[in-house]
């Protein structure tokens, strides 16, 4: 590589944006084929290619930042802005679901019986599993903050323990959510209530799984001595994402489970 007289990272040529684009094409085409022809071959192929792309792309980023020293302060600043903009885009993504929910519930149409929840629909008790889920996610927010402070203070063992605890709480939340879906007295096909409930809580659940995976990678990197007390943006990004997931759940709980029922 030629000598560069600036602190910015000139990225090497990479095949992963191309393979990622092909994976996206396969998955979107595969989704249409699955809906109409009931064949999952293409969507599964797309998913496998996407997972392989993500693993290898992120492996390259870890190599560049941890072992090659490309993540200088200006580069880290750019990554921070990128993560902030990504989380902002996610906020607007969920805003659409809340909009759909409030549009339907604040002025219920005669087809719904003029009331909310719609006539004849049994809702979930907000003070049972949903309240436990709220407590679990809030506790995980505390443990991820504990992990961050341990990391900044060089308390390696505490950082590993608190990070592992956060991941366990995330998995517990996912298991409780799966159980709740399995036992729910309504389905996604039960009108606008069922569709807004399952789409909003389902996408949140997907974000919890993504966040847990993100934190699991950080745990592995912490075990392998990748992070130092002043160079750990990978973990910081995961913590920001986890807090975002936390806050979205609080809005979901208050809006859909408590007020909406």
From Swiss-Prot:
**Please, which domain of life does this record's source organism belong to?**
Eukaryota
Name a biological process GO annotation: mitochondrial electron transport, cytochrome c to oxygen
Q: Which residues cross the membrane?
A: 16-34, 41-66, 73-105, 129-152, 156-183, 191-223, 233-256
Q: Which UniProt keywords apply?
A: Membrane, Mitochondrion, Mitochondrion inner membrane, Translocase, Transmembrane, Transmembrane helix
Instruction: Tell me which positions the record assigns to the signal sequence.
Output: none
Q: Which residues lie on this side of the membrane: Mitochondrial matrix?
A: 1-15, 67-72, 153-155, 224-232
Q: Give EC number(s), comma-separated.
A: 7.1.1.9
Catalytic activity field: 4 Fe(II)-[cytochrome c] + O2 + 8 H(+)(in) = 4 Fe(III)-[cytochrome c] + 2 H2O + 4 H(+)(out)
- Functional note: Component of the cytochrome c oxidase, the last enzyme in the mitochondrial electron transport chain which drives oxidative phosphorylation. The respiratory chain contains 3 multisubunit complexes succinate dehydrogenase (complex II, CII), ubiquinol-cytochrome c oxidoreductase (cytochrome b-c1 complex, complex III, CIII) and cytochrome c oxidase (complex IV, CIV), that cooperate to transfer electrons derived from NADH and succinate to molecular oxygen, creating an electrochemical gradient over the inner membrane that drives transmembrane transport and the ATP synthase.
UniProt record similarity statement = Belongs to the cytochrome c oxidase subunit 3 family.
- Please report the name of this protein according to its UniProt entry: Cytochrome c oxidase subunit 3
What organism is listed for this UniProt entry?
Danio rerio
Q: What is the lineage of its organism?
A: Eukaryota, Metazoa, Chordata, Craniata, Vertebrata
Q: Point out the gene that encodes the protein.
A: mt-co3
């Amino acid at each position: 590589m030629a000598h560069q007289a600036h602190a910015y990272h000139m990225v090497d040529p990479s095949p992963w944006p191309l393979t990622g684009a092909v994976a996206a094409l396969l998955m979107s085409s595969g989704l249409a084929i699955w809906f109409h022809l009931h064949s999952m071959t293409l969507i599964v192929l797309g998913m496998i290619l996407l997972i392989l792309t993500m693993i290898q792309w992120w492996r390259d980023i870890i190599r560049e930042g941890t072992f090659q020293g490309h993540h200088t302060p200006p580069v880290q600043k750019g990554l921070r802005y990128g993560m902030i903009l990504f989380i902002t885009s996610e906020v607007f993504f969920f805003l659409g679901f809340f909009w759909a929910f409030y549009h339907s519930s604040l002025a219920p149409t005669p087809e719904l019986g003029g009331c909310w929840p719609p006539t004849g629909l049994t809702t979930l008790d907000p003070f049972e599993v949903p309240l436990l889920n709220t407590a679990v996610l809030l506790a995980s927010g505390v443990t991820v903050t504990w992990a961050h402070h341990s990391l900044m203070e060089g308390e390696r063992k505490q950082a590993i323990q608190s990070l592992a605890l956060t991941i366990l709480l995330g998995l517990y939340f996912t298991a409780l959510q799966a159980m709740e879906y399995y036992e729910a007295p309504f389905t996604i096909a039960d009108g606008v209530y069922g569709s807004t409930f399952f789409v909003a809580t389902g996408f949140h659940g997907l974000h919890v799984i993504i966040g847990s995976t993100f934190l699991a990678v950080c745990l592995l990197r912490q075990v392998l001595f990748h992070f130092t007390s002043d160079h750990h943006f990978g973990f910081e990004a995961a913590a920001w994402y986890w807090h975002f997931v936390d806050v979205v759940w609080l809005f979901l709980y208050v809006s859909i489970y408590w007020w909406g029922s």
